[in-house]
């Protein structure tokens, strides 16, 4: 398992001209993200290379829409093994800023995952409540293995004990956007991960 990289302070950096003024500072640059994804892909490839010998047993990457779509695409290209994609859409009751852990499925998987090696790919784990529910739900479908890879984890926000095998970065409990992460469906297209200026979501 790769050791997650902790960031104790926000690293200021240039912001793209998109959404000028909305991004308070840059936490992770595009270069940092891509370098870490390359490391994660290599480690996942090493760990799974003897688990998926048959073409119909390619590593199955399960992603919850929409935040991790960019991450899972880049991660799949960094894994030196054949991979397949599956997507779920879930709604977690709670405020726009936090999850209650009460989840309903809006879109389920399109195939049976029985006896498959499944890797859940997340953009960010904060409370861990939704992920904890998802792990329990998918475990009932009897995959051969079930593990988690997340780009970001917020240790200070965790409220559920979830086992995460692959962590890109441990970050402070700040509101971040970019590289797939959004606020009100905006900012997903930023190439970096930045702190959103509080004035944007406190209006």
UniProtKB/Swiss-Prot annotation:
Q: State the pathway, as annotated in the record.
A: Purine metabolism; IMP biosynthesis via salvage pathway; IMP from hypoxanthine: step 1/1; Purine metabolism; GMP biosynthesis via salvage pathway; GMP from guanine: step 1/1
Please name the taxonomic classification of the source: Bacteria, Bacillati, Actinomycetota, Actinomycetes, Mycobacteriales
- What NCBIfam families does its record include? HGPRTase
PANTHER family reported in the protein's UniProt record = HYPOXANTHINE PHOSPHORIBOSYLTRANSFERASE, HYPOXANTHINE-GUANINE PHOSPHORIBOSYLTRANSFERASE
Cofactor(s) required for function per UniProt: Mg(2+)
This entry carries the following GO cellular component terms, namely: cytosol
> Which terms are listed as keywords in the entry?
Cytoplasm, Glycosyltransferase, Magnesium, Metal-binding, Nucleotide-binding, Purine salvage, Transferase
Under Gene Ontology molecular function, one entry of this record is:
hypoxanthine phosphoribosyltransferase activity
- Residues at which GMP binds: 154, 175-176, 182
Q: Which residues cross the membrane?
A: none
Residues binding Mg(2+) are 122-123
Q: Would the keyword Nucleotide-binding turn up in this protein's UniProt record?
A: yes
Q: Which GO terms describe its biological process?
A: GMP salvage; guanine salvage; hypoxanthine metabolic process; IMP salvage; purine ribonucleoside salvage
The main location is cytoplasm
What reactions does this protein catalyze?
IMP + diphosphate = hypoxanthine + 5-phospho-alpha-D-ribose 1-diphosphate; GMP + diphosphate = guanine + 5-phospho-alpha-D-ribose 1-diphosphate
Its family?
Answer: Belongs to the purine/pyrimidine phosphoribosyltransferase family.
Query: Matching Pfam families, A to Z?
Result: Pribosyltran
- Functional note: Purine salvage pathway enzyme that catalyzes the transfer of the ribosyl-5-phosphate group from 5-phospho-alpha-D-ribose 1-diphosphate (PRPP) to the N9 position of the 6-oxopurines hypoxanthine and guanine to form the corresponding ribonucleotides IMP (inosine 5'-monophosphate) and GMP (guanosine 5'-monophosphate), with the release of PPi.
Q: Which residues form the active site?
A: 126
Query: What name does this protein carry?
Result: Hypoxanthine-guanine phosphoribosyltransferase
């Amino acid at each position: 398992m790769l050791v997650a990289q902790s960031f104790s302070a926000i690293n200021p950096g240039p912001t793209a001209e998109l959404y000028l003024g909305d991004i308070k500072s840059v936490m992770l640059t595009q270069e940092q993200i891509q370098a870490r994804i390359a490391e994660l892909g290599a480690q996942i490839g090493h760990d799974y290379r003897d688990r998926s010998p048959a073409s119909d047993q390619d590593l199955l990457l399960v992603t919850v829409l929409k935040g991790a779509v960019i991450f899972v695409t880049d991660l799949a290209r960094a894994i030196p093994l054949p991979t397949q994609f599956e997507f779920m859409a879930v709604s977690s009751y709670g405020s726009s800023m936090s999850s209650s852990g009460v989840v309903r499925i809006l879109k389920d998987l399109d195939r049976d995952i029985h006896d498959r090696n499944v890797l859940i790919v997340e953009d960010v784990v904060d409370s861990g409540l939704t992920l904890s529910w998802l792990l329990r739900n998918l475990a009932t479908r009897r995959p051969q293995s079930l593990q988690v890879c997340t780009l970001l984890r917020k240790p200070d926000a965790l409220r559920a004990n979830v086992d995460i095998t692959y962590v890109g970065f441990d970050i402070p409990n700040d509101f971040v956007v970019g590289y797939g992460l959004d606020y009100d469906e905006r900012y997903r297209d930023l190439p970096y991960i930045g702190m959103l200026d509080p004035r944007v979501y406190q209006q």
